[in-house]
């Protein structure tokens, strides 16, 4: 992969456009930085280059739940990812130019947080051309992530008051260490554009 060129504004350029350059070890160095960066890149159709992913964590690099968030964003936008494998500490993500909608299924394959995956996908899906339904499999109740109940009873009512019609149904509970829980998130896009 060729390194991005310096742009006139000091930002990095790649293939003629701006690139979000993120050091994944910043602040707490958690996977949340990766998930929200991927969501923002997807929303803005702006390439993302992230280095030192989770460098300050015990297990550095992408874990299955982070990889699934990247793959899901790429799937929503028709994008491409380089470095998309468990353990990778550097990725280039090139989102597509339009946001897909419809029925999607993603399985984290571990007890990784389905709610954190949903948090990643809701912002782009709210600006798609039609309604979406996500069926997410993994963990629903962990110590280190908001639970499905928190999302259902705290976050989503706040989003609805803001005009975002997002609903969550718990299809099957899932706990560490196995996960295997399943939730479904349905939403309609917002009126207007970003």
Which residue ranges define each predicted feature?
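Structural preference for solvent-exposed beta-strand-turn elements
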Residues: 2-194
């Amino acid at each position: 992969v060729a390194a991005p060129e310096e742009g006139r504004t000091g930002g990095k350029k790649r293939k003629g456009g701006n690139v979000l350059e993120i050091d994944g070890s910043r602040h707490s160095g958690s996977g949340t930085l990766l998930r929200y960066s991927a969501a923002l890149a997807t929303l803005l159709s702006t390439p993302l280059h992230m280095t030192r992913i989770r460098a300050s964590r015990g297990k550095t690099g992408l874990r299955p739940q982070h990889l699934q968030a990247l793959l899901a964003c790429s799937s929503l936008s028709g994008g491409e990812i380089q470095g998309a494998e468990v353990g990778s500490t550097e990725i280039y993500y090139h989102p597509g130019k339009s946001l897909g909608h419809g029925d999607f299924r993603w399985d984290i394959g571990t007890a990784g947080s389905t709610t954190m995956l949903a948090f990643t996908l809701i912002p782009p899906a709210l600006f798609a051309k039609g309604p979406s339904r996500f069926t997410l499999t993994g963990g629903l109740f962990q110590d280190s992530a908001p639970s499905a109940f928190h999302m259902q009873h705290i976050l989503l009512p706040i989003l609805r008051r803001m005009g975002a019609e997002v609903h969550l149904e718990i299809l099957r509970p899932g706990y560490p260490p196995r996960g295997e829980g399943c939730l479904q998130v349905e939403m309609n896009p917002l009126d207007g554009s970003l």
